[in-house]
Amino acid sequence: MATPGFPSTEQRLGLYPVVDSLLWIERLLAAGVTTLQLRIKNADDAQVEQDIVAAIELGKRYQARLFINDYWQLAVKHGAYGVHLGQEDLEAADLAAIQQAGLRLGISTHDEHELAVAKTLRPSYIALGHIFPTQTKQMPSSPQGLASLSRQVKNTPDYPTVAIGGISIERVPHVLATGVGSVAVVSAITLASDWQRATAQLLHLIEGKELADEK
């Protein structure tokens, strides 16, 4: 049985960093990022809950859209803004409980079939990926490319869309040209030689925020 639909979010979420630590959440909120995701891997349960609680508090303090990856029970328990789930997590998660708690839901998709499945669940946004090759995580699927992204965006007018996977600063203009509403990045910020500068450039490209004058 389909869920009755999840709370809506902005049609264009803008820059959407996906990070793995509370430190990065703090840094990026202070840098002006308003949509972000905490994706914790390989941590013990007590530390995970502690970090999620702290991240949710920070998100509320900055009035940001903070999504918790995977740990939907903790997100519900502590009143997160939203949850992000991969396709492999959908069957195990209690989607009705997430919806009844008033949390937003984002869902990952990797092809047309998964996109169709996501639409039946009426989430708050749909992530489309991976667009380019990525070293951030092992992917069983092949990169979709810009042509596929453009087609999927056009076929998904009723949902905010997020492009993810191997998106560098240089690739952002081409990704935005597809009409996608948000661009998720990982290593473009976390592996940058100057993460603050990289974040400012991405905010400028994606959201039109002014860059500080060069000295």
From Swiss-Prot:
It is an enzyme of class 2 (transferase). Pathway: Cofactor biosynthesis; thiamine diphosphate biosynthesis; thiamine phosphate from 4-amino-2-methyl-5-diphosphomethylpyrimidine and 4-methyl-5-(2-phosphoethyl)-thiazole: step 1/1. 4-amino-2-methyl-5-(diphosphooxymethyl)pyrimidine binds at Q37, L38, R39, I40, K41, N69, S108, K137. Binds 1 Mg(2+) ion per subunit. GO terms for biological process: thiamine biosynthetic process; thiamine diphosphate biosynthetic process. GO terms for molecular function: magnesium ion binding; thiamine-phosphate diphosphorylase activity. Its EC number is 2.5.1.3. Its cofactor is Mg(2+). InterPro entries: Aldolase_TIM, ThiamineP_synth_sf, ThiamineP_synth_TenI, TMP_synthase. Keywords: Magnesium, Metal-binding, Thiamine biosynthesis, Transferase. The keyword NADP does not apply. Gene3D superfamilies: Aldolase class I. Pfam families: TMP-TENI. GO terms for cellular component: cytoplasm. 2-[(2R,5Z)-2-carboxy-4-methylthiazol-5(2H)-ylidene]ethyl phosphate binds at T134, Q135, T136, G166, V186, S187. It catalyses: 2-[(2R,5Z)-2-carboxy-4-methylthiazol-5(2H)-ylidene]ethyl phosphate + 4-amino-2-methyl-5-(diphosphooxymethyl)pyrimidine + 2 H(+) = thiamine phosphate + CO2 + diphosphate; 2-(2-carboxy-4-methylthiazol-5-yl)ethyl phosphate + 4-amino-2-methyl-5-(diphosphooxymethyl)pyrimidine + 2 H(+) = thiamine phosphate + CO2 + diphosphate; 4-methyl-5-(2-phosphooxyethyl)-thiazole + 4-amino-2-methyl-5-(diphosphooxymethyl)pyrimidine + H(+) = thiamine phosphate + diphosphate. Mg(2+) binds at D70, D89. Condenses 4-methyl-5-(beta-hydroxyethyl)thiazole monophosphate (THZ-P) and 2-methyl-4-amino-5-hydroxymethyl pyrimidine pyrophosphate (HMP-PP) to form thiamine monophosphate (TMP). NCBIfam families: PRK03512.1, thiE. Belongs to the thiamine-phosphate synthase family. This is Thiamine-phosphate synthase. It comes from Yersinia pestis. The gene is thiE.
